[in-house]
Amino acid sequence: MQETQDQLEQMKTMISKPAGRKDYSLMQEESVPSTPSGSTVGSLITAVGQNEHNKVRNDEEATSSASPDGTPSTVDEGDVEESNSDISGVNEQNFENELETSLAEGKSWHSAQDLNKSHTEEPIDDPNEDKMSEINLEPSNKGIEKNATVTEKSATILAKELSATTDVKKKCLRAAKPNELPAEEYCNEDLKGAISGLERRTSKPDLETNEIQDAKSLESGIGSSGNVNEVPKQNAKHPMDSCQNLEQSAGTTSAEKEAIRALESQSSGTSQASLAKHKSETNTSIQSSTQETAQAPTVYEELGSEAERSKSHAQAYKNQTDEKEMSGEIIKENPENAIDDASSPSKEYDTPSFAGKPEEGSENLKAPAKDGEPVDSEKKKKNGGTPIEGRPLQSLEGDAPQVPQRPNKRPPPKKPSSKIAAFQAMLKQQQLMDASKTKDKQIDSGNSLLSGKRANITNNLNGIFGLPGMAPGMTPGMVPPQRPPARQQTGSDGGSQSSENQTSSQSAAPSGPQRRARGPKGRKLPAHIANVEKVETSIKTNEIQVLKTWSLKFQKISPTCSEKDSEPLKDIPESGVVSPSNPKSMSELNGVPVESDVICERETDILQNSKNEMNDLEDTNEDNVKEPRQFSIPTHFDLGESDANQEESS
């Protein structure tokens, strides 16, 4: 007993801290409320925090009890020491109970809540907390018995929950095959959330094995000594270490609770019914455990059975992890059951350490090669270097057709202006018309030197080159335009003069409408150019007057001779002999005029004509009338008539 007390005093001195210093870690532990299940973990933490807080408060009261003048207060030092000794005795007893319960307690995810809250958060008052703290103040043997029952109940509850989650998982895997179950029984749970919860529960085997070892050592010590107080404190750990372990376990349990809440919200159909049933069972079991803690058993051997149960739970965890890994592979092989990670809600807790490890057998699983993917070199060697079935590699290289290069595209031609395009269209149309005309006409080979194809060359050049005397737009076969024939003059002089005056008075009409001069792009011309007066040029005309200058008149002239000529001829004797008394020439007798007679007639005619002309001139001067002169010129001499007249006169 004395040795144990010495060890407890040493541990107390290690735990104790200087007066006036507050331990915020213990204050944080004190602020953690107890779980509704009434487990001893929350009560242990609150008891330790209350003891430390009372100790610090007493120290502060002792220091502050001095008067403001610096004199000590009237409180005796003995009273303070007695109060401290009483508190230390209670603290030692509570510490022993806490140490033993922390070693014997199994892993229970209903034991604590999230410890990551802020320091300023106020603790929630719970009536169960006071009850558990009172229970912990009892002797150590009763506390061990009560804690053993609590851990046993928590272990059974954990086993039920694990079995329920595995059942849900199996149902979801079966529901992935639509041929086995109807569509009404399909599971819409978040499979990844359920599996991650199992992984987190089984992700700390080291902590569980350490607790089992501590329980074994405690069991062996109790069996050897027969009293809990005589158990050696070799395996005693610092309370802060135990608190850290509890924080870690509480973090995992809070993560598991969040996963279960996500499953409850996302599940539907049979999964919702199973989860509701499971939740009701857990609540009833927790309430029964809280009621049984008030009635502590009196058997000490339950501690050994608790260790054996923890071993069985550890073995069950390992089996479930194996089943979980197999189920994870099956789910990943079925792409229909895969759930997108982006759609799953973000979790505040950390992911397990082995979440990113590759699965076993994933290296052997390879997707089948597609048609467009290149074939590996090993496969090519096995197939004899034939990437295409039925043809060797060398034949493909030799027979591969070479793709000719595409010629460069010609640049698009520039668009001509409207005037140029109109001129080209007119020229083309004119050439077509000329070609059609030349085809109709057949060229004679005898008359022309050119024949056959050579003639077509000249015909095609007709519309391009102009010949002398051709107007623009004419072809060689066309006749040039002529002036209209002049109007015939009327018989009377007055009518001709009136028509000439009308033509001279008429002015030539303008060729076309005169357009207003415009500047570039329809702009107005400047003022000094637009205001210039236009000069109209008169068309010059040539007036022609026709006058009679001379004329020819043909008429008969009466014969005039001298008296000698006018004498009648004598009768010619029948014999025809000329007598000497009437000497006449033979010409007279024969009716032929003599030269002297002809000269006489000519002279008389000339004289008579000259007289007539003089008379005509005098008449014109008197009448003042412009008349052409008339000349009578004998064109021939009628000898026969003159002879006949002479005969008649004779």
From Swiss-Prot:
Residues 488-507 have a biased composition (Low complexity). Disulfide bonds: none annotated. Keywords: Cytoplasm, Cytoskeleton. Residues 1-148, 197-529, 559-650 are annotated as: Disordered. The keyword Cytoplasm applies. Involved in mitochondrial migration along actin filaments. This is Altered inheritance of mitochondria protein 21.
